[in-house]
Each structure stands twice: as structure tokens, then as C-alpha cells.
A protein has these predicted regions:
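AMP-binding/adenylate-forming catalytic domain of the ANL superfamily
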Residues: 472-496, 516-521
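Conserved AMP-binding/adenylation subdomain of ANL enzymes
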Residues: 181-203, 207, 211-251, 265
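Gly/Ser/Thr-rich phosphate-binding loop
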Residues: 160-162, 166, 224-225, 249-254, ...
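Conserved AMP-binding A3 loop
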Residues: 28-32, 159-186
Length: 522
């Protein structure tokens, strides 16, 4: 029996329509080509002995070669993990080994890290290369060339396995339960996308790296719904606008730092492009500062949609632009996983009070890590991602920070996000992170790390200006005492800043004092 989300059915219906398009080059992979290539790779996997529940890993830049491999795994009941190619060799080795991959497919430009990952992965049996030749490593194109372009006999749905943001150590692998359903049934996200307006007429623009949960899930789900997915090799703010205009993009996905970079384009550049085709600008992955989101809604209109979720898939919250305008700062109401706000003793807190967020949604476990799995669950079966937040009287969820990011200065809780939002839209600030650093008197001192905009002169003058500007929005006791101006931030694949790295790299010799303003302190 054929199911509507079976790629064979989609290829018969959409044929030479583009399934995936590389934004920069315009190179495309049609539905028909995707069907044939993914079938050939699927047969290769079966020939190599891979069976339902086995695991493969991929190590590639954003490129068309990824998708036939994704789909081959998806249609043969395999788990597949795309490894962040910006990781160190040690980190890549850990993921390829931890996920127990039997096959690794990598691109030729990443051979150095791929070779080390392969050498350190105990269960790896086969390795293939795309995008060039590597001595001693078989070409995937050559290996699949003689395989049939028709489906294998035992198709079933596979699943992607992600590694959640490693904000406090090694990335945590989230192993989902393999669905025991025929290929073509589709995954949960595939069936949710029509609620966001996805249809065969949709054109989706992915601006993020294809080793992260949302870009993979939405790019796969787009094609499942008969639509076209465009991807960028790396985010560029003006190119994004150009692609939206030229390709008539209907849906695009961002993280807040991308919004900031787009908003800081000159006005004449932003007005140069026709963005009228855009139905939804979806954002997630990190909290969006209120001034940034206000500016995006002013620019695009009520097309900005936010969701909050984790790779653990234990919750999913959504909020539209009209809802957000009357609940500024919220990440929405629950679609999956009701939220509970608990204090340190596990008691449920009333609306308006900040506590740790727990969810009674779908269960999960961290792969081969029972201690982290246990720490993320309580006796009621609820689970947490480690975030702090609160609920209002209407059930809208608001995020504060992660518990590990909280600053306690002079016995007072300081939430970095609030301080960051007070400065995020200053024209001299390209990005900002606020951390707590050791202080003999206060325990922790509030320290801002600022990535300055191009052409800005960083120094004591700018520090004073930022302090004055922030003082118009937040109480004086929340103002940073020192600031460091940097050229780049260490980041996770999602775009989140690695605060632990900033804390570890803190050097008081580089810190610039921010003036103490003559305002009453708490």
C-alpha cells in the first residue's frame, strides 16, 4: 500500500519539480532524482548488512549530497545523525562513536576530521566520501552506481537522532523510539507543517546548518508535503532577502541573531527587495529580545512566528505575531507537553513566579547516559530541559534563562537575558552575552561580552554609552560592572553562545569598567 508521504508517490506526482535547491549556485535535486538516488543508497545499505534500528552518521557541509543519504536512511528504518562539522576532531569522534554508527558518509573537504572520527568509532564498519576523491575511501557515487533505483522490499520509517546543545559538557544524544510503521507514514513534524501553511505550493528557505534539528526536520518535512526546500551554505543577511525575492519564498526559518543582522542592514538595502511572497518567518533556538522582535514585526508585518522546543521533543510551544504583541516576551502556549513551573523543592509555583520548567510531554532518554536521563526526570515522569521561566494567568510561557546561566550577585538573582535585551538593539552592538564572573565582595559580578558592529570604536567611551543606554531600561543593580569587546563568540550549532567558554576565557586584564551611574541601587 502506498502512503501519501512515501517519496515514491511524491516523485510520481512531482517528477521534475525541485525538491532541494542550493541557494548560492541554483543547483537542484528533483523529486525524481531524489527518489532514484535515495533508493540506490538504500540498496547499498542493505548490501552492507544494515538493518532496521542500525545507525549511520554524516559529516558534510550544507550541500545537496546530504539529502539522498538522509532519505535512504529514512526509508530503510535507520537512525541517522548529522555531525556538526565545526566541532573539534575529539568532539566528532565522541558523537560518531557514541551513536554507534556503522557507516560514515563525509565530504572530501572534511577528510581530516572524518578520518579521525572514523578511527575513533568502535562500531564503524564502512566509510564513503562525496564531493571529491580521498585515497583509500570509496566514493559513494561509485558504490551506489550499480544499485537498483527502485525501493527496497522492507521499507519502514527511520528517524534522525540529534545531539542536544552541550552547554554544560559533552553533547547529549537523544535516541527517539523507532516508529514501527511503513515508510510513507511520516513523522510528527511532517504532519504539523500543514498547520503552518505548508502545501505543494510552499517554498521553504533554510538559513541554518544541516546538522541541527530544525533545519533537518523542516527540510525533510517540506519535501514530505510536496514542497521545495532551498538551503544556504551559510547565512548571509542580504542574500537571504535576495533569495526570498527571486525564489518567491513562502516560509523561512531563522534564529534571533540572524534577525539582528538583517535589521542592521542599511535601510536602503532592506527596502531594495520584494518580500511579499513570504507568509511566515519562523524563529526558534534561542530567546529573541523584545526590541528585535518588535522591529521584525514592524518590518514584515504579522508574519513572524515563534516556537519553543528542544531536541528532546518533550514539548512544543507556538505563538503567532498577533498573540505575541499582546503577550510580549512569551514563547506561546503548549501544543505538546504541558508546562509546570517548580521551585527548588519540586513544588509547583503560581503564575508570574520564576522557577524551573518541567513538562509532562513525551518521554525521552539520553543515549548511553542513565545519569543525565535520571537528572532530567522527576518521580512524576515530568522532564526538564534545564530552562527557567514562568507562566502567566492565561497559560502563556515566558523564558528567563537556564539555571546554569543565573547570576547571583550580592545575594540577588540576575537573569542574563534581561540585561542582554536592554542592549541588544544598540547600534554599536552586533551581539551580546552577559555572564557572572568571580567577585570577592559580591560573589559574582555582572560582566558583558560585546561583539561590536563593524566600524565601531570600542573602548571606555562606548562602555559609558552602553551603561547609560541600559540604565533607561533596567534597574541599576542589574547593570554590568565591566565589559569586554570581542571579535567573535563561541557558539553551538543552534547559534546559542557558549557561556561556559566565555566564563573560562574571562581575563580581568581585558575588562573595561562600566561607570557606576548616580541612580538608586537595590
Amino acid at each position: 500500500m502506498s502512503l501519501p508521504m512515501d517519496l515514491t508517490v511524491l516523485a510520481a506526482e512531482h517528477g521534475d519539480k525541485a525538491a532541494y535547491v542550493a541557494a548560492e549556485s541554483g543547483e537542484a535535486l528533483t523529486f525524481r532524482e531524489l527518489e532514484a538516488r535515495s533508493n540506490q543508497i538504500a540498496h547499498l545499505f542493505r548490501q552492507l548488512g544494515l538493518r532496521r534500528g542500525d545507525h549511520i552518521a554524516l559529516l558534510m557541509e550544507n550541500r545537496l549530497d546530504l539529502f539522498p543519504v538522509f532519505w535512504a536512511a529514512q526509508r530503510t528504518g535507520l537512525y541517522y545523525t548529522a555531525v556538526n562539522w565545526h566541532l573539534t576532531a575529539d568532539e566528532a569522534v565522541y558523537i560518531v562513536d557514541n551513536c554507534q554508527a556503522k557507516v560514515l558518509v563525509s565530504s572530501a573537504p572534511l577528510e581530516s576530521i572524518a578520518a579521525q572520527a572514523a578511527a575513533g568509532a568502535a562500531r564503524l564498519q564502512h566509510r564513503f566520501v562525496v564531493g571529491g576523491s580521498v585515497d583509500g575511501v570509496p566514493s559513494l557515487d561509485t558504490a551506489m552506481a550499480d544499485q537498483p533505483a527502485t525501493p527496497v522490499d522492507d521499507q519502514s520509517e527511520g528517524y534522525y537522532m540529534f545531539y542536544s546543545s552541550g552547554t554544560s559538557g559533552r553533547p547529549k544524544g537523544i535516541l527517539p523510539e523507532m516508529p514501527d510503521v511503513p515508510f510513507g507514514t511520516g513523522l510528527t513534524l511532517d504532519h504539523q507543517l500543514p498547520n503552518f501553511g505548508f502545501s505543494p505550493a510552499a517554498i521553504y528557505l533554510n538559513t541554518g546548518p544541516l546538522y541541527h534539528a530544525a533545519p533537518i526536520g523542516w527540510s525533510m518535512g517540506t519535501v514530505r508535503n510536496g514542497a521545495t526546500a532551498i538551503f544556504m551554505s551559510r547565512f548571509d543577511p542580504e542574500l537571504t532577502l535576495k533569495v526570498i525575492e527571486e525564489r518567491k519564498v513562502t516560509h523561512a526559518q531563522f534564529v534571533p541573531t540572524m534577525f539582528v543582522r538583517m535589521l542592521k542592514l542599511p535601510q536602503e538595502v532592506r527596502e531594495r527587495y520584494d518580500l511579499s511572497s513570504l507568509m511566515l518567518a519562523v524563529h526558534a533556538a534561542a530567546p529573541c529580545p523584545i526590541p528585535v522582535k518588535e522591529a521584525m514585526i514592524d518590518w514584515l508585518g504579522p508574519k513572524v512566528l515563534e516556537y519553543y522546543a528542544g531536541s528532546e521533543s518533550n514539548c512544543f510551544f507556538v505563538i503567532s505575531a498577533p498573540e505575541w504583541l499582546s503577550h510580549k516576551g512569551s514563547v506561546g502556549k503548549a501544543v505538546i507537553g504541558r508546562a509546570h513551573v517548580l521551585d527548588a523543592e519540586g513544588n509547583e509555583l503560581p503564575p508570574g513566579e520564576i522557577g524551573q520548567l518541567w513538562f509532562d510531554g513525551p518521554d525521552f532518554e539520553y543515549h548511553q547516559d542513565p545519569e543525565k536521563t535520571a537528572a532530567a526526570h522527576d518521580e512524576r515522569g515530568w522532564s526538564t530541559l534545564g530552562d527557567l521561566g514562568w507562566l502567566d494567568e492565561e497559560g502563556y510561557l515566558y523564558l528567563a534563562d537556564r539555571r546554569t546561566d543565573l547570576i547571583i550577585s550580592g545575594g540577588v538573582n540576575i537573569y542574563p537575558r534581561e540585561v542582554e535585551e536592554s542592549l541588544a538593539m544598540h547600534p554599536a552592538v552586533q551581539d551580546i552575552a552577559v555572564i557572572g564572573v568571580p567577585d570577592d565582595e559580591m560573589g559574582q559580578r555582572i560582566h558583558a561580552v560585546v561583539l561590536v558592529a563593524e566600524g565601531v570604536d570600542a573602548g571606555t567611551g562606548l562602555a559609558a554609552e552602553l551603561s547609560r543606554d541600559a540604565a533607561t531600561r533596567i534597574a541599576a543593580f542589574k547593570l554590568p560592572r565591566t565589559v569586554e569587546f570581542v571579535e567573535d563568540f563561541p557558539r553551538l550549532p543552534s547559534g546559542k553562545v557558549l557561556r561556559r567558554n566565555l566564563i573560562a576565557d574571562y581575563d580581568p586584564e581585558r575588562a573595561v569598567s562600566m561607570p557606576r551611574l548616580n541612580t538608586q541601587e537595590k
